[in-house]
């Protein structure tokens, strides 16, 4: 938004933005793209990857086949990318880089959402401790660095440093040392690019608000319960006053739309204020500064209240816990079966060394969709 209230239609990059012409490069040297920027190329490679397509059949909260309207990792990633791009334009940073990070942030997620990730991590640590655990941010980086097989001259997607860095939201010191330059910020305690910060916050905006929508559609949470949540209650009351005859379903959609807008407007204003205070003149200045993207204290409290409500009432609902328990059993039994007899694996996933074998099994399971994991489990454990 300009000072006169007009909407920014073209994004002229600010001095603190990541400039695609000054990227820190790719792992494997390539000629520059002819009709795209480097960050556009990254975004396009992510969209065309096999891992991105598989997100359509991976869980957000509900198992993929539970309902046609529930969000999957793919629809969630698209929603994150839309929010992230809006934020990037408002702050005059690279929309293409922000979008690429947003689209790639869940590429390493297992089937069955966080339940699958937690169980796969437990299996790796208990049954193959020498191989290290499993963490979906690291797996997302592994997907784009190694596991995708689309190009003749290299494994992975060969993305720019800035995109790879943005994908890696969390990392232990041990893993950071193994990753080289892309892990350095976890050792020297610096920040990622502003584009990465925005993509991370866009993820939070998307999943909190859209999980409200899915939770209501499923019947696991109710409008009455949500009246306890300040940001929802306030906007729902405003909608009811303005549109007293509106059907509950549409009133809920209007409420969620307003909640998202509140978060985006606050995030934009707060981030711009921090940028003015710290006056970064370059992308490197952003890295040396404290986090520049963020919510105001008041809106952060409201967002945290909503997050806690969802944790207590949706993610811990007995029906979700039942799905979680089934998912954990499927992941654990698949891992145990493959580790006990690697001949059950497709040939491409068989390895000579035990440590390598465990990692290959985790790659195989992490790459499964919900329904593929269910079918694979049935093939191994059911007669007929």
Curated annotation (Swiss-Prot):
Q: Which Gene3D superfamilies match?
A: Hypothetical protein af1432
Presence of keyword Cytoplasm: no
One BP term from GO: dGTP catabolic process
**Per the record, a Pfam family?**
HD_assoc
Task: Supply the CDD domains for this chain.
Answer: HDc
Looking up InterPro entries in the UniProt record yields:
dGTPase, dGTPase-like, dNTPase_2, HD/PDEase_dom, HD_domain, PHydrolase_assoc_dom
Region span, Disordered:
13-42
Q: Which residues form the HD domain?
A: 73-208
Compositionally biased spans, kind Basic and acidic residues: 28-42
Q: What terms describe the molecular function in GO for this protein?
A: dGTPase activity
Name the UniProt key words of this record, in alphabetical order: Hydrolase
Which pairs of Cys residues are joined through disulfide bonds in the record? none
Q: Which domain of life is it from?
A: Bacteria
Family label: Belongs to the dGTPase family. Type 2 subfamily.
Q: What is this protein called?
A: Deoxyguanosinetriphosphate triphosphohydrolase-like protein
Q: From what organism does this protein derive? A: Bordetella pertussis (strain Tohama I / ATCC BAA-589 / NCTC 13251)
